[in-house]
């Protein structure tokens, strides 16, 4: 709950945690909440992880589960969420993309260009493995005050951008999740 409240209340949230606590599940829950609480067409979710396999087989698998359990709009595929907006006159519009998962090339600064919506949520799963260039590309999506960023992972690499944003004064609201907070730890 603290993580969702942080995303609600802060533009940027960093969650540092141990292994095996369900980080991808937490990210998927936040994504489901974000899409469900905004008008289709006004919100867009961009997700990434260090590998394409992590994007599809881990994060988007969890997003699909969240979507399937809830009364959430649209449909979820292996790496996309599509939904039908309601037009001002009450008729359904044309189905549109409201979120996707991608693993761009590590040095592709244009990876997330062309994404425009009044509210954008950027999610990095396993953020410790994301290269600096993709952090810069994602930051370019934070152009308006209603955009949000959630980065979640294990800050194991002392040279990573994720380790830096977990430090005080980084501009991120940082939440630590201990192994002792997880039911997976016995």
Annotate each language-model stretch with its function.
Residues 1-186:
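Phosphate/NTP-binding elements of NTP-utilizing enzymes
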């Amino acid at each position: 709950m603290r993580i969702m409240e942080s995303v609600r209340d802060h533009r940027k949230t960093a969650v540092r945690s141990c292994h095996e606590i369900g980080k991808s599940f937490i990210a998927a829950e936040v994504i489901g909440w974000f899409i469900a609480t905004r008008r289709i067409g006004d919100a867009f979710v961009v997700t990434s992880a260090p590998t394409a396999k992590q994007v599809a087989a881990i994060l988007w698998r969890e997003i699909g589960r969240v979507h399937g359990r809830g009364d959430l709009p649209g449909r979820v595929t292996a790496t996309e969420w599509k939904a039908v907006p309601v037009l001002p006159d009450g008729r359904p519009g044309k189905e549109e993309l409201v979120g996707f998962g991608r693993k761009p090339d590590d040095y592709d600064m244009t990876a997330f260009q062309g994404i425009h919506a009044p509210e954008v949520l950027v999610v990095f799963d396993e953020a410790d493995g994301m290269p600096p260039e993709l952090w810069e590309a994602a930051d370019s999506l934070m152009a308006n005050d209603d955009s949000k960023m959630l980065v979640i992972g294990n800050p194991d690499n002392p040279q990573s951008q994720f380790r830096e944003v977990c430090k005080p004064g980084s501009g991120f609201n940082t939440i630590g999740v201990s192994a002792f907070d997880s039911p997976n730890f016995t």
